[in-house]
Amino acid sequence: MGKLIFQKMAVEDYQSDHDLEEPSVYVGTYGKYNGEWGIWGKWISLVKCGDYDTFMEVCHTLHADEEDPELMFQDYENFPERFYSESCMDEDTFDKIMECYDMDDKEAFEAYMDATGDDDVDSFRENYMGEWNSEKDFAEHVIGECYDLDRMMGHLASYFDYGRFARDLFSEDYHYTDGYVFRR
């Protein structure tokens, strides 16, 4: 009967290909950094790792020359800064980075996090209203979706102050950040 042999991939198979713009971290250790090596490690692609356990296994394999490596994530690329920490990456953070990577509207999500402090993707999706050139453009959209001013007001509709309506909307109900609109 044949024997099944599990062959692990080499650390090099998980290295970042910077051209693909995948989320990656430069993985070193505090021991090497504070010792003779200085900054020594490799860029590891979180996408190629696929999950947190594989990522941690790759990191520890990379630094298998140390008895108990204290991992140091010395740099990062292609994911929001708020998810970066030099000293640790937990499974929840790894999963958030991967969820963000899979999004079509990453820039809007980053603007949402900056505006609200909330990094929950479901909250973002619930509160994201789209991309607009200005607060006034969004206000015009809201009025157009909800009311027929021409029918309601006739020729007086041209006197409606969309700018003032926009100020009211964005003073309490909405955020406008980098061209993106979010409910509060």
Name these PLM-found stretches.
Residues L46-Y52, M129-N133, Y159:
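Conserved aromatic
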Residues G2-Y14, E21, Y33, A139-R184:
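Acidic, proline/glycine-rich low-complexity IDRs
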Residues G2-H63:
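N-terminal ordered "arm"
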Residues G50-D119:
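Structured domain cores in non-transmembrane regions
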Residues Q15, V27, E77, S85, ...:
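Compositionally biased, intrinsically disordered low-complexity regions enriched in proline and serine
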